[in-house]
Amino acid sequence: MNKYIWLVRLWHSKEEPMFLRSVSSSFIFIHGVPRKLKTRTVFPTLCGTRRASFAAISVYISEDESFQEKRIDSVENRGIRPNHQTLKWLLEGCLKTNGSLDEGRKLHSQILKLGLDSNGCLSEKLFDFYLFKGDLYGAFKVFDEMPERTIFTWNKMIKELASRNLIGEVFGLFVRMVSENVTPNEGTFSGVLEACRGGSVAFDVVEQIHARILYQGLRDSTVVCNPLIDLYSRNGFVDLARRVFDGLRLKDHSSWVAMISGLSKNECEAEAIRLFCDMYVLGIMPTPYAFSSVLSACKKIESLEIGEQLHGLVLKLGFSSDTYVCNALVSLYFHLGNLISAEHIFSNMSQRDAVTYNTLINGLSQCGYGEKAMELFKRMHLDGLEPDSNTLASLVVACSADGTLFRGQQLHAYTTKLGFASNNKIEGALLNLYAKCADIETALDYFLETEVENVVLWNVMLVAYGLLDDLRNSFRIFRQMQIEEIVPNQYTYPSILKTCIRLGDLELGEQIHSQIIKTNFQLNAYVCSVLIDMYAKLGKLDTAWDILIRFAGKDVVSWTTMIAGYTQYNFDDKALTTFRQMLDRGIRSDEVGLTNAVSACAGLQALKEGQQIHAQACVSGFSSDLPFQNALVTLYSRCGKIEESYLAFEQTEAGDNIAWNALVSGFQQSGNNEEALRVFVRMNREGIDNNNFTFGSAVKAASETANMKQGKQVHAVITKTGYDSETEVCNALISMYAKCGSISDAEKQFLEVSTKNEVSWNAIINAYSKHGFGSEALDSFDQMIHSNVRPNHVTLVGVLSACSHIGLVDKGIAYFESMNSEYGLSPKPEHYVCVVDMLTRAGLLSRAKEFIQEMPIKPDALVWRTLLSACVVHKNMEIGEFAAHHLLELEPEDSATYVLLSNLYAVSKKWDARDLTRQKMKEKGVKKEPGQSWIEVKNSIHSFYVGDQNHPLADEIHEYFQDLTKRASEIGYVQDCFSLLNELQHEQKDPIIFIHSEKLAISFGLLSLPATVPINVMKNLRVCNDCHAWIKFVSKVSNREIIVRDAYRFHHFEGGACSCKDYW
């Protein structure tokens, strides 16, 4: 201490040597000024008029706030002429001690008086002081008058303007900076991007800034790229954000969090989760913010399995006590309906903040627990936490979910009392409350009372009218937005587009699309995905694809929406192709894409690829999602994998109707009709509710098995559950009775349909046609036209088939020619087949050949097969060989062609040619499908093959068959035996093995069934001439009705005649 006293004494002496002045100043610099000397009394005396010492002491006392005003006054009062160093330290003192704005202005005045305003260092200090005190005008004035500005000065000014959301000024300053040849650096772009994030900036401006960043070589700067990722993500350009992220060679925590958060917010949740996993695998420790973003993604895709895995990682890494992470977990569990886990986390939290309560209240509100949300709100009060706008908005949301309008009105009054009435969130929640409670008048009144500049409220009104399917008012609101110059955001256009989708208004949707293009929102991932969804659902798949390729980039939602569109319209091959292209571009599918890809595999019965997608879903964590499980049930059941179908079915939630329907439908479509019916019976036994889809599949299964008894049982359940008035179900029943051989029941069912549509008429017309009642089919067609029901392609198939079966060639040709002229229908291949069949049945083979050669489309195999079959009947070898030649070009391995050609040679007695044809079949490994017939006796299905001797009653059946044949021969039956004799001659086999299966089935039926029961037989091939003749005579000698359903139609035999009138 003595050294300081000595120094003071020297300063108080009247005659101090010059060298002591320099010594004392140096001493102060070295040792500093002790606190005891820092007093109001010592300071003025010590300073005297010595400028150098004053400046030196200023360095040490600048941290003492009590000296700020005193020392500045000393400068003015004592007439000291401070130098630039003194003023610099005084300014630093003002900054360190938070001096008043007036003090700084005094110093600024001194600087101007002394002409030191050109001093760059002083200008920087003054500039910093004004910025520190928030005097933007003073800072800008100093900035403009600076002789030279460093890059740091520019950056400070830009950041200050950005913090005040003065976007125009930021860009103006940036342009000025570049024009003055100042090279921007990381800090510059950071400030500019901050300004962009704070306001609405046109996309092309952001692109220009990005281009400048690349030009300056800052593509690897996290300082610049992290906010750029966030900016792109915030505005929905997640693909561009990902491009910036992928371009960073060294990514920091903020880079990962920005990208994960951006993906999560832009409905790329699956990609966000995968990116989080990549980050963890690379050894980068997740931050609470990273956990929050990825948990938010899990919440959006509703994946409890992934959420629980992340919860485990939270515990493992020691984040279980982090309030930020716990809040995200509570929100996740509440959203997924796991209230126990959410409340457990809440109760174990060491610290709960307002966000915690808000999260819990919001979770309860979203789950529909309005009462619990209100109780928690009261507890929040008891814990001394005040509600904020988020709390009150969540409580209003709870009222919206519960539909409790009265409580919502009370909250409305409460928010007004607390001064939150003009809060944007609460305004949106209240408006949504009135809209969802269908109080559209109050909603509109409230909307008009609010600050209509808030785009969120406009969006709510768009959604409100959309919920009412009021497209006119929805569009009116949209037009009013444009008049009021309300700038749309990424949710505005999707709101009205979704209404267009629901109402099927493509024209208005296209108008909205044009507005989207004008405002450059087509690059927004969310808008792009909704546009694709609209065009896909409304049938313009090519337009949807064009948008996907041009604008979607790597947005997984857009790609999976496109896949779903193809699946909806049964373009399963395109759906799978798109799915593969998505994977090839490095886009990992979400649960929507995987589900629709599996559905496409089911439609194509592509089992192997479906199993690969199943494995991919297991790896991705989506295999337990209910829609995916239902798609798996459909895949395996349609592919005939019964065991795998039930395994997938057992993984679904109990009682899920979609899974049950998938099982019934899948088995039915794969031909496992008995299994489909067993599942249907089990459904009813377990009390599972049926619907149109269930009954439709069950009825079709009964149709395919031609099991009249089971069909009637299904019909009984339909009647019991009240679905017998549903037109779709009734239509299926008409077809079922027709396929089971009961045309009378089909007629009865048709008459009971209250609202007949084109499917109803088609069902009865085709039923009459298949059963050989051509006149009735044509009468029904006339009634259909008179009922103002427009026919379609299916109708005309039934009409032309009816004309064919009853030999009305000219009338049939007239119907065919009227398809385009009267009904606007272009003939399809099946219509050409009907005409060829019509001509050939009438023996007009040459005319049929000419008709085929003049077809505007290439004849398919069925056309040529129809002609060849007729040539066998009419023994026309020339045209038959011509047809066979074309048929073998199309289907060289088809056994039916060789069989028909062999039969043609046989009926033409060209035995060598016949044998050569059969030899070719053997060489090519082509095998003829064996004939098989079925008949139901005493609730059991009995199956017979040609010459079958395996039945337990084979001897009795063959013996009875011989008796029937003898009796038929006595009244005129003559066996077509030349082919049989040739078989016997060449193959030297027992004649019994050439008895066709339908003859054995009929013999067994007549032997076993009561005399009053019709004989119902099914056959997999077409009935031959000999069998047809034999059955006609047997129906007469047995006095029984015999119904045979072959591969082409029904034959009703009774009294020695057939309903087909020998045209089959």
From Swiss-Prot:
KW RNA-binding (keyword) present: no
Superkingdom classification of source: Eukaryota
Chain positions covered by the region annotation Type E motif: 863-938
PROSITE patterns linked to this entry: PPR
Swiss-Prot/TrEMBL GO biological process terms: RNA modification
GO molecular function: RNA binding; zinc ion binding
PPR repeat spans: 83-118, 119-149, 150-184, 185-220, 221-251, 252-286, 287-321, 322-352, 353-387, 388-422, 423-453, 454-488, 489-523, 524-554, 555-589, 590-624, 625-655, 656-690, 691-725, 726-756, 757-791, 792-827, 828-858
Region span, Type DYW motif: 970-1064
Keywords, sorted A to Z: Repeat
Segments of this protein annotated with the region Type E(+) motif: 939-969
Similarity remark: Belongs to the PPR family. PCMP-H subfamily.
Name of the featured protein: Pentatricopeptide repeat-containing protein At4g13650
Gene of this entry: PCMP-H42
